[in-house]
């Protein structure tokens, strides 16, 4: 009876191992096949960035997982803006093309709220705040609407909808409407910004890979950001870590000009090390 129990136990253990290998690897459970999902997705982005595109079958072979697993990975990476799906695979994200604000608002919303909550800790009491245009700043506006006593300047029309619910002074800059992010821009906007001083500015980025600072996809957006930087005592850039894998069109500042960079803990360690030498990086 004892022998039979041990034998069955051995068989059961072997079957478990077999199932694990079948689910996680097509080649017998190598280290590549056992990568955690987040690690694999990070390497998928790096691979596509280096090659320009990749087929689902090739990725499945490379990472030793099923095609269905790769499809789920690519769906998630597309949702966070790290890659673009193509027929049978994926390509580099078209980061030079502006993405409508309605699309960006829902991406990584829980992460954005967590980052903005950390940003609230940097705001001086009764401070004057500048909020950039972008989906992350809408999260910040919703949090600020629960506070009172602040003066908030913004060029983002959608942001004012949220600020209207709070007990703060809200100032909207003038200028020409940019329908991509529902913000004002142009000479009137920069001219107004040049007349004010603020305690702290919160800025976003659509990607900073291959740049020495935060970057965006439109020159007019970069111009507004460049205008507010010298008018601010404190400059804070807030972005989720996926932007580390996206190369946007135009850099608007150097990291050494940024006082704080708030991002999540999925930021690649090499990127964290590099940025930490130039600015204060806060991981949430």
Outline where the language-model segments fall.
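Conserved phosphate- and dinucleotide-binding cores of soluble alpha/beta proteins
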Residues: 16, 28-36, 46, 53-57, ...
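Intrinsically disordered, low-complexity regions of eukaryotic proteins
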Residues: 15, 23-24, 75, 134, ...
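Short secondary-structure capping/turn micro-motifs that flank functional sites
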Residues: 64, 93-94, 179, 209
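Conserved SAM/SAH-binding loop
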Residues: 137
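HTH-adjacent hinge/linker in prokaryotic transcriptional regulators
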Residues: 29, 33-43, 47-57, 62, ...
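Short, Lys/Arg-enriched N-terminal segments with co-localized hydrophobic residues
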Residues: 4-31
């Amino acid at each position: 009876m004892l022998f039979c129990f041990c034998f069955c136990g051995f068989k059961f253990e072997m079957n478990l191992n077999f199932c694990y290998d079948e689910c996680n690897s097509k080649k017998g459970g190598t280290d590549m096949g056992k990568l955690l999902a987040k690690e694999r997705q990070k390497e998928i982005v790096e691979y596509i960035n280096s090659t320009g595109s990749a087929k689902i079958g090739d990725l499945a072979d490379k990472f030793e997982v099923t095609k269905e697993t790769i499809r789920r990975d690519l769906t998630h990476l597309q949702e966070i803006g790290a890659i673009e799906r193509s027929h049978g695979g994926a390509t580099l994200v078209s980061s030079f093309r502006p993405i409508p604000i309605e699309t960006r608002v829902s991406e990584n919303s829980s992460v954005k709220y967590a980052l903005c909550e950390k940003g609230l800790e940097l705001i001086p009491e009764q401070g004057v705040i500048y909020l950039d245009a972008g989906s992350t700043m809408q999260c910040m506006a919703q949090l600020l609407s629960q506070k009172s006593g602040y003066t908030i300047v913004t060029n983002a029309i959608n942001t004012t909808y949220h600020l209207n619910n709070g007990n703060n002074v809200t100032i909207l800059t003038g200028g020409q409407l940019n329908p991509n992010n529902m913000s004002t821009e142009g000479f009137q906007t920069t001219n107004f910004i040049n007349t004010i001083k603020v305690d702290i500015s919160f800025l976003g980025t659509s990607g900073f890979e291959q740049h020495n600072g935060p970057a965006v996809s439109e020159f007019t957006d970069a111009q507004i950001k460049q205008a507010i930087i010298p008018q601010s005592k404190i400059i804070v850039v807030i972005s989720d870590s996926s932007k580390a894998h996206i190369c946007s069109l135009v850099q608007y500042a150097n990291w050494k000009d940024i006082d704080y960079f708030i991002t999540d803990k999925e930021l690649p360690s090499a990127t964290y090390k590099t940025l930490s030498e130039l600015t204060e990086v806060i991981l949430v």
